[in-house]
């Protein structure tokens, strides 16, 4: 455990905000060196559209197990000055400690445990560790890498954290849209009748968009950020709203996508432009069921508390693999709280048993 805490301090104090590709690249290089120190093999450093990711494959045969991690965080440079890395009273704190650097270090140490037990890296043939650099931005450069690497795998284990320790058996899919109304500017005092008020038309559309939601099916459609106009005395020629969509079911996600693209203007002279679309497909419960059952069995075998399962609204990279029909179990990382919040922390006593469970899950799926 002391080595894990040392490694966590090392990665947390790097600062890897998602938007800073250079910082993410530097963090990836340091993490690659750490991986080589712990498991004796350096991962590949992959750059996709300017974003750096790491991939460590064991063996040359088919991929059987994929560990999904990310090393980018939502925290800007300088956060450590306010929220420094600390270990006190059984709590680990620092930016990214919960989401999800603890899970990433757990992946590395679970792999090291298995190597030490086997004494030979061939025991891990079929294992891939992925550590991406843009998860907090929607995985725009890494989603295809994830899907390609996991294709045909027996299991994908996602090292995202869990506030209550429950493993994630289902997650909502996410879609993001930008609805822009194009109108015509005019002087608001001299000749407003010559304008086409994009703000008014957007105000008419937003309740209609929100009504696409279906509470019974768990589908949420939420207009969020809104912009309109340029100056207080000008009829707005352009107005835009961002729409956040979450859906438990693929059919619902597709329904919303169809309805969003059918949005039309009614105000004469106004036009509507809808951009964006589906980002992550729903992670439906069937994808995790047998892996969760096996996790419960293995927990009993190694003498730790049986995990519980839950469904959540937030998405992860596991949505991509679950959406492709690959068995996927999520939430295997840190136990704590405060994702994207200043009280972010991980409970230290939970790290060793969950690392042991991860090692058991990996070995179980690698066994022929």
Locate each region found by the language model.
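Short beta-strand segments
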Residues: 67-69, 130-132, 157-160, 180-182, ...
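Glycine/serine-rich anion-binding loops at beta->alpha junctions
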Residues: 75, 91-106, 187, 317
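A structural signal for isolated positions on well-ordered beta-strands in alpha/beta enzyme cores
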Residues: 44, 66, 128-130, 273
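Metal-dependent amide/peptide-bond hydrolase catalytic core
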Residues: 16, 75, 161-162, 166-169, ...
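Short glycine-aspartate micro-motif
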Residues: 64-66, 92, 99, 154-158, ...
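Acidic/His- and Gly-rich active-site-bordering loop/insert found
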Residues: 1-95, 116-121
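Acidic/histidine-rich catalytic neighborhood of metal-dependent amide-processing enzymes
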Residues: 100-101, 105-172, 214, 366-367
